[in-house]
Amino acid sequence: MNHQFRTSAPKAYGLYDPQNEHDACGIGAVVNISGKADHRIIDLGKQILLNLMHRGASVADEVTGDGAGILFQIPHEFFLEELDRDKVALPDRGAYGVAMVFLPREDEVRWRCETLLESEIVASGLRLIGRREVPTDHSCLGEIARACDPRIFQFFIHGNGLQGEELERRLFVTRKRLEHRVRREIGEPATDFYVASMSSLTIVYKGMFLAPQLAAYYPDLSDLRVKSALAIVHQRYSTNTFPSWRLAQPFRMIAHNGEINTLRGNINHLAAYEKKMSSPLLGQDLSQICPIVEPGISDSGAFDNCMELLVRAGRSAPHALMMMIPEAFGPRYHISTDKRAFYEYHAAIMEPWDGPAAIVFTDGRLVGGTLDRNGLRPCRYVVTEEELVILASETGVIEFPPQKIRQKGRLQPGKMFLVDTVEQRIISDNEVKGKIVRQR
C-alpha cells in the first residue's frame, strides 16, 4: 500500500489542526411515502447525486473526489441470495445487522481488526454468521483515491432474538467498543479501519468519489435486487479539509451541508458530562462507549455521533435534532409556551450545535430535513402525485412534469420536514414538534 495517501486526515502540524475541519456540500434524500421498497429509489438517489456534482470538488488530479455516498435500507432479499451462494442462511428481516467496514489492506493488520470485531460481537451476546467482500471496481478511481482505498467487507450479525430498537442499541454499543479497542490495541497501523455503518435497518455505501464514481465503484448499487423505500445522498466539498474515505458522507444517521461553528464547545461539553451521564436503556454500557465523539472526525461526523447517542438512549430522531439545533426561542420570538419551555429545559442539557446547517436524516423509518435557526443553508422539497418526496440542496435535482407535482417549497429557518414510512404520511413541523414538547 502507498502510505503517501491515507484514508484519514493528517496529524496537527504548524497552523493546521484536523479539529478545525469543515465542509460545504450537496445533500439529498428521496423517499416513497408508502414505505414500499423499490430499486427506483436507489436510481433516483444516484440521479440526485449526479445533479449535485457541482456542489462537490476534486483534488489536483481532477478525478479524485472529496467524497460521495448513499445511505438506504438494508436490501434483505439481495443479501439473502448473495449469502446463499456461501451456504449462509440469514434470519428474518430485522433479526440481524450488517456492518459495512473499511479494513486496512495490510493482511496482518486486517486480520487483527477482524479478530477484534468478532470478539466484540461475541462479547455483546450476538453472533457473526457470515461475511462478504463487497465487489468494487477500482478502475473508475483517480490515482490518489486508488492509492488509499480500503478493503471493504460486510459482516452479518445475528441478533440472537433481539430486534428493533433493542438490536440497534446492541449494535451501537458493539461498534463503539470495537472502535475504542482497535485504537487502543492496534493504534496507528489501523488508521484505515472504519465502520461506515452497523445496523439492522440501514447501510451506507460511500468513499472518496466524485458523484459518477459511486455507482461505478460499487456494482451492488446497479443490481436490481437492491431495493429500498428511502435513500440519503451526499456530495462533499472539503472547503478547508483533506478528503478521505472515512469522512465521506452520509454518516450513520445524517448527511450535512454547512459547518458547526460551535464544534469545540460542543465536544468539550459532551466530554465534561460523560462521567455524569446515565441511561436506563444503555445502563452500564454507557461507560464503555465513551468518548462519544470519534477522534479525528469532522464536524458533521461529531454531530452524527451525538445524535446517534441521543437516539440510542431512547429519544426519537426529531427529538434529538430539536435538542441539538433548537429554533430561535428568545422572548422576541412568537412560539408556544410548551415549545419555549422545551427549549429552555434542554438548553441546560445540550449546548446548541450552531452554524450554517442543512441536514437530511433517517433512522430507517423516518426521513426528514431540518435547517439551522438562521436558515443559512438551503433545502428544497418536492412532493409528487406518485407519493415520492425529494429533499435536496436545490430544486431540479430530479425533473418531474408540472402536472405530477403535488406540492413544492423550501424549509424555513429552524423548521423540520418529516416523512413517516410506516404511517405513510408527511408530518408537519407543528405536529411533530407539538407532540414532542407535550410528551411526558
Q: Model-derived features: where do they sit?
A:
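Conserved short alpha-helical segments that host acidic/polar catalytic motifs at enzyme active sites
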Residues: N2-R440
